[in-house]
Amino acid sequence: MAKVGKRTRAAREAFVGKDMVSVEDAVALIKGAASAKFDETLEVAMNLGVDPRHADQMVRGVVTLPNGTGKTVRVAVFARGAKADEAKAAGADIVGAEDLMETIQSGKIEFDRCIATPDMMPLVGRLGKILGPRNLMPNPKVGTVTMDVAGAVGNAKGGEVQFKVEKAGVIHAGVGKISFDAEKLAQNVRAFVDAVNRAKPAGAKGTYLKKVSLSSTMGPGVSVDLASATSH
């Protein structure tokens, strides 16, 4: 335990006095302080000037990171017939209809992304209370209710990240592994922040992007200069 404590303390000391730094400096600091025995994820937290309790201030979307996430994404697809075959050929991990619904209802959820063809939504809709809170409910706004199941599976496995604002006006996402090259992590951060900026809802008033922080899975966070966090 003492060893872990020293490591954590050393990591935190490296962050003292570091605030509103560039993305590159933040990434370098986080990579240098990462000390977990596994390949940690670089995580972005964005504080937005929205109140998601109002429908016209909801922020959600999807972005394909230029350098991927480094994460193995397990994909489930609700489809029948030719579309089910298409999903399997594209590399979906689980494909089904009523059988998949029953598996999920039993509490067995072994996937990170759920895709459905439009005709399957009446069936999938019964799972709203299970999938909704886990942010797994297929949604046409983020391309997971589609007839192009092969494309959706490919995107999910190829570095696509979904985002949705939480009650406090915060968006969290993993944008790569600490083992990634620093430049690639910086590119991913900016791609994600740009996507959230583009998703600014019509009802947002005042300052939209308030704060951007970066951290590793186990490490402390550091605030990033907002101008540095965007690519333009």
From Swiss-Prot:
GO biological process, any: translation
Keywords, alphabetical: Repressor, Ribonucleoprotein, Ribosomal protein, RNA-binding, rRNA-binding, Translation regulation, tRNA-binding
A UniProt-annotated Pfam family: Ribosomal_L1
GO MF terms held by the record: rRNA binding; structural constituent of ribosome; tRNA binding
GO cellular component, one term: cytosolic large ribosomal subunit
Subunit structure comment from the entry: Part of the 50S ribosomal subunit.
Family according to the record: Belongs to the universal ribosomal protein uL1 family.
Protein's job: Binds directly to 23S rRNA. The L1 stalk is quite mobile in the ribosome, and is involved in E site tRNA release.
Record's protein name: Large ribosomal subunit protein uL1
Species, as recorded: Cereibacter sphaeroides (strain ATCC 17025 / ATH 2.4.3) (Rhodobacter sphaeroides)
